[in-house]
Curated annotation (Swiss-Prot):
<dbReference type="GO" id="GO:0036524">
    <property type="term" value="F:protein deglycase activity"/>
</dbReference>
<dbReference type="GO" id="GO:0006281">
    <property type="term" value="P:DNA repair"/>
</dbReference>
<feature type="active site" description="Nucleophile">
    <location>
        <position position="185"/>
    </location>
</feature>
<feature type="binding site">
    <location>
        <position position="91"/>
    </location>
    <ligand>
        <name>Zn(2+)</name>
    </ligand>
</feature>
<dbReference type="GO" id="GO:0030091">
    <property type="term" value="P:protein repair"/>
</dbReference>
<protein>
    <recommendedName>
        <fullName>Protein/nucleic acid deglycase HchA</fullName>
        <ecNumber>3.1.2.-</ecNumber>
        <ecNumber>3.5.1.-</ecNumber>
        <ecNumber>3.5.1.124</ecNumber>
    </recommendedName>
</protein>
<feature type="binding site">
    <location>
        <position position="86"/>
    </location>
    <ligand>
        <name>Zn(2+)</name>
    </ligand>
</feature>
<comment type="function">
    <text>Protein and nucleotide deglycase that catalyzes the deglycation of the Maillard adducts formed between amino groups of proteins or nucleotides and reactive carbonyl groups of glyoxals. Thus, functions as a protein deglycase that repairs methylglyoxal- and glyoxal-glycated proteins, and releases repaired proteins and lactate or glycolate, respectively. Deglycates cysteine, arginine and lysine residues in proteins, and thus reactivates these proteins by reversing glycation by glyoxals.</text>
</comment>
<keyword id="KW-0346">Stress response</keyword>
<keyword id="KW-0227">DNA damage</keyword>
<dbReference type="InterPro" id="IPR029062">
    <property type="entry name" value="Class_I_gatase-like"/>
</dbReference>
<keyword id="KW-0378">Hydrolase</keyword>
<dbReference type="InterPro" id="IPR050325">
    <property type="entry name" value="Prot/Nucl_acid_deglycase"/>
</dbReference>
<keyword id="KW-0963">Cytoplasm</keyword>
<dbReference type="GO" id="GO:0008270">
    <property type="term" value="F:zinc ion binding"/>
</dbReference>
<comment type="subunit">
    <text>Homodimer.</text>
</comment>
<keyword id="KW-0479">Metal-binding</keyword>
Length: 283
């Protein structure tokens, strides 16, 4: 007899009234091994340009019933794109708003993946000891070595990033200076930082995690309650077009903004980003 896994969110004892996803939702949406493939870049980039990763530094996301969702950056959404970019020759730096360590959704870590886990261990210190984003922003100019800004997904991207003036300044710099902006799933919530000023992303099309899907996840205990706001609705208000209404692993390129719809798009987004950046910088 098959025992049905529980759909009740699991208690996170590190914080009051906080919860991890249910056993059932983890069985449906996580895997001990990723779908990493196609890492084939025979002529990698050899220059000085690199990636700036803007990571999440807060773990707990309040839901509508007062319960906290224990979140952060999704490991697959973070590590697979970076694996491709690193293999293509692009090093990366990590920054958070506070300068404090990156928070990961460790419950989604592909802990048996023989390629991704060594890559994570090799670069863990960058996530544990990130730069403070304000310090990075203060140093940005037309000659800065960052070729792209990458905002990983995970619900942690909903916390702080959409209101951050430093995130807005970094994105503004990237777009004005013809750099790449890469993001997926909930990461594009960071684009909301641009809504209170000049919005250079007005009219852009992207892929992102659908609001409709976020509204369904509490039913299986992925989150302990419903979100108090939905980033897709807000992105549309600031003139952005979300081209997907489902989750298929879709990726999209609009000029130099490269996006994906979910963790299922992480590998494809990594390929797309590596190919586009190699064409731009190593062509």
């Amino acid at each position: 007899m098959t025992v049905q896994k529980s759909k009740n969110p699991q208690v996170d004892i590190a914080e009051d009234n906080a919860f991890f996803p249910s056993e059932y939702s983890l069985s449906q949406y996580t895997s001990p091994v990723s779908d990493l493939d196609g890492v084939d870049y025979p002529k990698p980039y050899r220059g000085k340009h690199k990636i700036l990763v803007i990571a999440a530094d807060e773990r707990y996301l309040p839901t509508d019933n007062g319960k906290l969702f224990s979140t952060g950056n999704h490991p697959i959404e973070t590590l697979l794109p970076l694996y491709h970019l690193h293999a293509a020759g692009f090093e990366f730096e990590v920054a958070t708003i506070s300068g404090l360590m990156t928070k990961f959704e460790y419950w989604a870590m592909p802990h048996k993946d023989e390629k991704v886990m060594p890559f994570f261990e090799q670069h863990k210190s960058l996530f544990r000891n990130p730069k403070k984003l304000a310090d990075v922003v203060a140093s940005l100019n037309a000659d800065s070595e960052y070729a792209a800004i990458f905002v990983p997904g995970g619900h942690g991207a909903l916390i702080g990033l959409p209101e951050s003036e430093d995130v807005a300044a970094a994105l503004q710099w990237a777009i004005e200076n013809d750099r790449f902006v890469i993001s997926l799933c909930h990461g594009p919530a960071a684009f909301l930082a641009l809504r209170h000023g000049d919005n250079p992303l007005n009219g852009y099309s992207i892929c992102a995690f659908p609001d409709a899907a976020d509204k369904q996840t509490p039913e299986i205990g992925y989150m302990p309650g419903h979100l108090t706001w939905y980033f897709g609705e807000e992105l549309k208000k600031m003139g952005m077009n979300i081209i997907n209404d489902d989750i298929t692993g879709r990726v999209h390129k609009d000029r130099k903004v490269l996006t994906g719809d979910s963790p299922f798009a992480a590998n494809a987004l990594g390929k797309l980003a590596a190919q586009e950046m190699l064409a731009a910088y190593a062509g």
